[in-house]
Amino acid sequence: MKLKQIFIAFLSVIALYSCSEKEDIPADADDNFITKVTVSVAGETYSAVIASDTITVTVPYTVSLNGASATVEFTPSAKIMPDPATITDWDTERTFRITSFNGQAHDYTYLVIKDEIRSKGNVELKTPAEIVSFAATGTSIIKGDLVIGSDSDDAEKIKDISALGMLKEIEGNIIIRNSYTGGTLTGLDNITKIGGLSIGSEENSAANETLEMVSMTKLNEVTGNIHVYNNGVKFVQFDLLKAIEGDFVISSSSITTLQMPELINVGGVLNIFGMGKGVISTLVFPKVQTVKNSLSINEISTLKSISFPELIETGSINFSSLPIEFEKLSMPKLSVINGDCLIISNYIQGDLFSTTGNVSLTNLDEMSNLATVTGILSICNFNELSSLSNLKNLKRIGSLKLEKLINCSSPIDISDAVFSAKDSEESIIRISECKKLQKLITKDDLSNVSVDIDAWANNYVDFNFKKVKKLSYTTPDKKVFTLPIEEVHGDFYFGAGMKSGIIANNLKFVDGYMHLKISMMVSNLEFSKLEKIGGQFFMEGTLNTPKMVHNFSNLKSICCNSNPSYAKEGKWSTNNLPYGGLDIRSTTTYELFPVLEKVGGTGITIHGFSAFSCPELVTIAGSLSADAASKLTSFDMPKLKSLSGVNFVKLTSFSDFSIFETFIRDNQITEPNWIVSGCKYNPTYQDMKDGKYKPAE
């Protein structure tokens, strides 16, 4: 029993000792955390952000934490090394070690971030004093526009903005007003990003022409536009700029140097305009790959070469006023133009013997990769451009215009190109005044293309297409022209010199009008397969060759479309006759239309025929009109059953009107549509009603 009591007493002592030992171990004995850090200097306190094992204090870049004091809160039972109380330089990165009561270490890295000073909203600096005052704030980021100067007539001049060197970013636009009279933009050199730069406008060029150099040496990003309209600007230089999300426009009559060595992409237009003057001879954009909208370089009188060695795609090209001494255009990788491509030289228009275009550009070989032009490709006014072999790789084109290429003699081969204009525009081929050009090679089917060839100086441009939407061909040459054409889905015009002729024996139909213009002594009119002319057939000129070869052996209808098109409408100024659906002039006799059955529209108008025969003609929807036919005595139209009018003037041998008896009796011809004057016999409408078809014997 005594032993048992002793044992119980022993256990009680041990238990009491254990309880005393637990009371000496803190509850946070396993914790080793820094929970809060603040740093104070010059009356300002900055709270740190603690994330994971990093303590970050952010202060303005103008604030030094050397000599600052700090408050560091951490686990109460833990120990910290080094002791924050012993530190005075809080600008320096360092490591703090927190050791828990139980001996577990936790390291924290202390960092200082020097942040930019931001200014919200727009900043306007209209005077030198405002420049100095703003610079003193240390602001480095403006979250709006920066406006320097004023356009007011009495504004105080600002000559120096170098105090603004602390600026690094302008989220809005930098706008330079007229009262800034400095020669450079020194003071903006440290800016790396801007919303845009604006000096003058397209409507009002900047008046401060003392500004000669536009340069921001550290600028690498522009989220909007660079617009410089200032005729004093000579030098433009952005050494680090890689991308412009908007436009890049430089308009100056003094431009001497333009350097953009790192520029790759332009999200808007790229426009360099010399105001008809300029000093620069070469423009090189060594790294530009894309220009989303228009690429335009114009009115630089001294320009001799343009080079875009890496350009692949652009919205359009507008080089529409290149100097007459411009020598070289290099775009070897350019493949896609999503719009028009205008390559046009200035053209000096003097008298007949002194007109001239460009005299230096001989080829466009360094554009041979071009595959797509969705708009019009226009190449004009190049006297010495001898070849356009670069067009061979075209796969898609909207339209093609070649004009005043005086010495271009090589064939124009676009045989792989499909014509497909953007936005439902009409595709056209226009060739004019290309003196030595002899051949155009395309796909056979140009049913969606209107072709206009105006040959020049007794020249004829041969072509291979068989189907076309519209065809207009003009040449002063005097020969017989053989055309391969089979289908014209719109209007057809052909004009040639005296004594010439046309052979188009594969032509089956013309949906629009057919206008043939040969002044006189036509040798051939051969259209042996032609069955239909949907609009007017207007023969301008006089058929006066007795041995003319003619063939309209299958032509059955003329001007019978529901809404026929006309080459000539209204009335002739002589004798007031209507322009007919079939309108033709001759001084001799031809049986031109042996199977013609119907003429619609305004009917038939003939001039000067000695006889006129249409043995199969059944219908004339309008009137039968004739004038100046001194030998015409009758019409050979035995099957004619429909006629709504007669208009005869000066048919001095015509006296027998019995052919019209039926049409008068059936009231197909009414009194207002019966016009006869100057003929051998001039019956009135009532005479015809009374059966007086011939003069009384």
Language model features with spans:
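Extracellular beta-strand-rich solenoid/capping regions of secreted or surface-exposed proteins
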Residues: 70, 153-165
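Sec-dependent signal peptide recognition
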Residues: 2-9
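Short, exposed beta-strand/loop patches in secreted or surface proteins that constitute
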Residues: 43-50, 72, 88, 139-140, ...
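C-terminal motif of bacterial Sec signal peptides marking the signal peptidase cleavage site
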Residues: 15-18
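Short, low-complexity, Pro/Ser/Thr/Gly-rich segments in the mature regions of secreted, periplasmic
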Residues: 681-697
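Concave beta-strand-loop units of leucine-rich repeat
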Residues: 121-127, 144-158, 171-187, 193-218, ...
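Beta-rich interaction/scaffold domains
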Residues: 20-135, 140-144, 169-172, 187
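Extended Gly/Ser/Thr-rich low-complexity repeat segments
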Residues: 64-76, 164, 285, 331, ...
